[in-house]
């Protein structure tokens, strides 16, 4: 058995926003993404109840987007690197979500509490070659697991690099345009400095109508977030 050291859980005060999170914090964009993934056709974005824990950052991480629709709770996370520990991270996060949604006193009630069913999805656009879609399970972390695990949590990861999941990209135009923007940044970075690569990608996408309105309104912030994100994964 591996010896473990106890570590104090602290908030990650250096958490930085990402272009993905900012883009899909818009209810219309988020609903479009949800519809594309689930094969639905909702038009009223107010059906989305946003429950992202804005002020709670646990274990050095923060979930990007959390929302409830049709009594289901969805946790969306964007990742630029492969991370097999997402099930464990989401376990901590969903526990915090349920604590927020449930009155503690009702835990001692004789009436069964009803909870929104959780769904965990990661959107991956790292440079490492990965399949279009895969699933990680919490039980993969267990040592000496025998038989069916008594606690399981499954995270589905969807590859959103431009040449992957093309049908999904077509069904959610904003996601497809986001993939084009990221690809353009990386293409530019092969022949110029990262700062120049990002700025030129933003200008070119605006000219071509790729995320044009979003980039015009948030140009400076998008440039800063993109540079920080790409630099972190060089």
Predicted regions and their residues:
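Elongated, amphipathic alpha-helical interaction scaffolds
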Residues: 1-234
């Amino acid at each position: 058995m591996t010896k473990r050291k106890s570590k104090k859980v602290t908030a990650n005060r250096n958490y930085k926003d990402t272009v993905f999170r900012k883009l899909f914090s818009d209810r219309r964009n988020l609903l479009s993404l949800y519809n594309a993934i689930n094969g639905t056709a909702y038009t009223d974005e107010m059906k989305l109840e946003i429950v992202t824990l804005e002020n709670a950052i646990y274990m050095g991480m923060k979930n990007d987007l959390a929302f409830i629709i049709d009594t289901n709770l969805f946790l969306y996370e964007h990742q630029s690197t492969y991370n097999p520990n997402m099930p464990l991270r989401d376990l901590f996060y969903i526990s915090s979500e349920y604590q927020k949604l449930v009155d503690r006193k009702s835990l001692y009630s004789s009436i069964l509490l009803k909870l929104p069913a959780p769904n965990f999805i990661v959107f991956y656009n790292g440079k490492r070659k990965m399949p279009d879609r895969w699933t990680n399970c919490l039980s993969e972390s267990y040592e000496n697991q025998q038989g069916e695990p008594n606690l399981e949590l499954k995270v589905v990861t969807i590859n959103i690099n431009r040449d992957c999941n093309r049908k999904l990209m077509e069904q959610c135009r904003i996601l497809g345009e986001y993939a084009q923007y990221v690809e353009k940044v990386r293409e530019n970075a092969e022949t110029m400095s990262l700062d120049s690569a990002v700025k030129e990608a933003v200008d070119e996408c605006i000219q071509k109508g790729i995320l044009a309105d979003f980039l015009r309104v948030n140009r400076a912030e998008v440039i800063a977030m993109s540079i920080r994100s790409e630099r972190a994964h060089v």
